[in-house]
Amino acid sequence: MQKFLTTAPVVAAIWFTLTAGILIEWNRFFPDLLFHPM
């Protein structure tokens, strides 16, 4: 349990960083799809 408590924040931080980076890159190449998905 102690290992989970120490690794969970690290995994969450990496996951949020990757998600934000993917969204930023997607918005840079396809700026209209985020605002007009249909």
From Swiss-Prot:
It is a single-pass membrane protein. Belongs to the PsaJ family. Keywords: Membrane, Photosynthesis, Photosystem I, Thylakoid, Transmembrane, Transmembrane helix. The keyword Membrane applies. It is found in: Cellular thylakoid membrane. The chain crosses the membrane at residues 4-24. This is Photosystem I reaction center subunit IX. The keyword Coiled coil does not apply. GO terms for cellular component: photosystem I; plasma membrane-derived thylakoid membrane. The gene is psaJ. One of its GO terms (biological process) is photosynthesis. InterPro entries: PSI_PsaJ, PSI_PsaJ_sf. May help in the organization of the PsaE and PsaF subunits.
